Amino acid sequence: MQLLVITIDDCDEFLATLEGLRAHGMNGIVFQSTSLKHALLNSNVDAPPIFGRVSKIMSHDFESSHTAFLLLNDDQLEHAKRVIRRNTHGLGKKGVMFTLPVLSFEG
């Protein structure tokens, strides 16, 4: 059993990926998320001097990302990765996916 975590920046690609996973009987939980960089740009914490000027000129408007958690059997994992790669045209810098082993679960 594996926990597959995926974050995709492009909303349309994320939704297409979810539809593809759902079509193959895979379910999960979706959270709205944002990158650490964007979260810090919008924080009230004073940035270190080296980053202060950069953060002043960068736009604070950003589109949030979405993160999905899917609990998959080992035999579903590679298929799920193929669905993700297909819908994101290779993922690249558009997001990230990783897995964590799950030793037990209930529910």
Predicted feature locations:
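Positively charged, small/polar-rich N-terminal and surface patches that mediate targeting and assembly
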Residues: 1-107
